[in-house]
Amino acid sequence: VLGFYGPAWLINYTIAPNSGEGDNSSAGDWACCAPNIGFFWGGTWLLAGKNVVDTEKAELVRDFIHWVTLDCTEDGLQYKWANGTLNGEGGTKDCVASGTVMAKSNGELDFLGGQNMFDAFVPANAYANGKNLTQYDESINTAWRDAVRQYAHGEVDRDTAIENFKITVADTLGLDVD
């Protein structure tokens, strides 16, 4: 395999656990780089109800949301998450929303041969925007996954999978598909 396009979590939660064990492991042979094209698909949301009438509870909610989203100090959630210290030392280092946090964090992974993954992820954040999002994205992604799954399981050939995908998108969403 030459490489994969994917979200930051692909490294820790998909590739690494499936890289083999012992002498058959490819751990340490992997690296990551900034993409030549951007990728963005939503994100994680944190919401709070606007009708909290108890001032003390409202302040706690405010402080919690600030800690999760905006606190870039070493005591903030994103810093602890990025550095693998959320539940004490030795946790999984992970990409976080804050480029500020990643820029000052240690993203070195043994799986990546000691590479600091944040050196690739921080510049890649410039590509993350929602300008290409549409109301059709989830439906199109589902149709694509279904077509690829049929092809991967040998149920259809490549051309049929592509044609089925186009038909599904056109029929389901009423879109013109070339």
Describe each PLM feature range.
Residues 37-38, 54-61, 133-141, 154-158, ...:
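Solvent-exposed, acidic/flexible segments
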Residues 78-81, 174-178:
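Charged/polar, low-hydrophobicity segments characteristic of intrinsically disordered regions
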Residues 8, 14-18, 68-72, 148, ...:
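Sec/Tat-exported extracytoplasmic proteins
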